[in-house]
UniProtKB/Swiss-Prot annotation:
rRNA-binding is among the record's keywords: yes
Segments of this protein annotated with the region Disordered: 97-130
Source species of the chain: Endomicrobium trichonymphae
Xref: InterPro entries: Rbsml_uS13_C, Ribosomal_uS13, Ribosomal_uS13-like_H2TH, Ribosomal_uS13_bac-type, Ribosomal_uS13_CS
Stored NCBIfam families: uS13_bact
PROSITE patterns (UniProt xref): RIBOSOMAL_S13_1, RIBOSOMAL_S13_2
Name this protein carries in UniProt: Small ribosomal subunit protein uS13
GO molecular function, one term: structural constituent of ribosome
């Protein structure tokens, strides 16, 4: 297995797909890396030479923010929004959708599992004996 940016890339995958296993690298950036290093995107990870793996690793570590650094930056951005009490920060704090989605229905992923309220007895429903 080739190790790039602290991640073991799967051997049997194509290079363009395997690079996407790294947090912060998607299809566009993966293709850009392959073009810049003039590698074959259809080449399997197990067929890469040590020199090619080293070139990929150097390019990613020098030019891109990936994995732990990127996760830390995203978390600090969210924390900053919460601290300055912006609308987006309040939505994050309350675990509600941040980008304007409706919440009357849907938003189950963000709001969590439904809480069912049991039928309780009200004082007016109890019969009074005189």
């Amino acid at each position: 297995m080739a190790r790039v940016a602290g991640i073991d890339l799967p051997n049997n995958k194509r290079l363009d797909i395997a690079l996407r296993y790294i947090y912060g690298i998607g299809p566009a950036i993966s293709d850009e890396i392959i073009k810049e290093l003039s590698l074959n995107p259809a080449k399997r990870v197990k067929d890469l030479t040590e020199e090619e793996v080293g070139r990929i690793n150097n390019l990613i570590t020098k030019n891109l923010k990936v994995e732990g650094d990127l996760r830390r930056e995203v978390q600090s951005n969210i924390k900053r929004l919460i601290e300055i009490r912006s609308y987006r920060g309040l939505r994050h704090r309350r675990n509600l959708p941040v980008r304007g989605q409706r919440t009357k229905t849907n938003a189950r992923t963000r709001r969590g599992k439904r809480k069912t309220v049991g039928a309780g007895k009200s004082t007016s429903s109890i019969k009074r004996v005189k």
